[in-house]
Structures are given as C-alpha cells and as structure tokens.
C-alpha cells in the first residue's frame, strides 16, 4: 500500500487553473511541491490493485488506510506491507483491531530495539512492486496528463489508465 501524487497542472499555473479547483490542493512530498490530488493504492503480492481511491492532498495515508481496513478489509486477515510512514504502536493496534496485520520498516531511531525476522525483510523487499505499479501507471499508461479540459476528462483519463494496468497485467 502506498500513495502517489497526481499533479493536475504545473505549480506555476496553479493559481489560474480552474478545471479541478474543487478537489485539488497544494502538497509536498519527497520530490517537492505539487498542485493536484493523491492516488491511494493497495495491491496484492503480484502488484494487481485490490483497492484504490483518489483523495485530496489533505488526506493522510494513515487515515485512508484506517478507513479502508474498517470498511473494505474488515476481519479479512490481510497482511499489509507499508513504508516507514505507517509506523506507530497505536496505529498498529488500530489495524490489528480490524482483524488485519501491518508490517512496516523500522525507523532509524528504533533500529537498535526491534530486529526483524528474515521473512519480514523479504516481504518488505516486495514493497517495491507497488512502486513499479505506480511507474507503469505514470510512464506507460499516461496517468499524469494535464491535457484534459474538464473534471470528467481528468477522471476518464485516470480510469482508463487504471483499467489498462489491470487488463494488461
């Protein structure tokens, strides 16, 4: 599970951008600032999407995952593998209370206290598959396109890109 930014226009054109003004916003990630929305995605071990949602930039990844585990994946017994942004004892307990499990990497400040087992390290290496899924969506299936002239055009482009990924898998 992870999220990726979907810019709807370039940052310097964001003030005059009117098409997606209702659901777009400013945010920052490791690559810098952007104006757009976020795609939240949960995939299985093969990289096939199980759940996805387009959210505003203000929606936190942890909030979305908590909502998904309480509705879609309640009492399923899934093992979710996430990055270090999903760390936290209280958050792990919330996910465990929904009947699911959460495996995350260990932050640098906690590395001396909690060693991971070999199978956990191998599962964390599989997390790169969701990044590959995002790369395919953006590079091959043109998920990030700023050529649409209406909100429906953006949504149609996003749906076609995700459908192409699922069918092409």
What are these regions (language model features)?
Residues 1-84, 88-97, 107-108:
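Polybasic low-complexity intrinsically disordered regions
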Residues 7-13, 113-115, 157:
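Short, solvent-exposed polar/charged micro-motifs at secondary-structure junctions
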Residues 29-32, 147-158:
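Structural motif
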Residues 58, 88, 127-130, 156, ...:
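A structural signal for well-ordered alpha-helical scaffolds and beta->alpha junctions
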Residues 62-65, 134, 160:
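A general structural signal for well-ordered alpha-helical segments in protein cores
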Residues 79, 84-150:
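Helix-centered, glycine/charged polyanion-binding patches within enzymatic domains
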Residues 153-169:
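Charged phosphate-binding loop/patch that engages nucleotide di/tri-phosphates or the phosphate backbone
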């Amino acid at each position: 599970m992870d999220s990726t930014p979907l810019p709807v226009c370039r940052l310097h054109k964001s003030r005059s951008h009117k098409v997606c003004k209702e659901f777009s916003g400013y945010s920052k990630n490791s690559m810098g600032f952007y104006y757009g929305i976020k795609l939240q995605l949960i995939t299985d071990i093969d990289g096939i999407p199980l759940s996805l949602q387009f959210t505003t930039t203000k929606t936190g990844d942890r909030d979305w995952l908590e909502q998904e585990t309480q509705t879609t994946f309640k009492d399923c017994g899934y093992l979710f593998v996430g990055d270090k942004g999903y760390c936290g004892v209280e958050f792990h307990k919330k996910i465990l209370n929904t009947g699911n499990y959460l495996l995350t990497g260990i932050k640098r400040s906690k590395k001396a206290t909690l060693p991971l087992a070999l199978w956990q390290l191998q599962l964390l290496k599989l997390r790169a598959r969701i990044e590959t899924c995002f790369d395919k969506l953006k590079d091959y299936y043109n998920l990030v396109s700023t050529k649409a002239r209406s909100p429906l055009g953006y949504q149609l482009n996003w749906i076609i890109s995700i459908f192409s990924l699922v069918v092409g898998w």
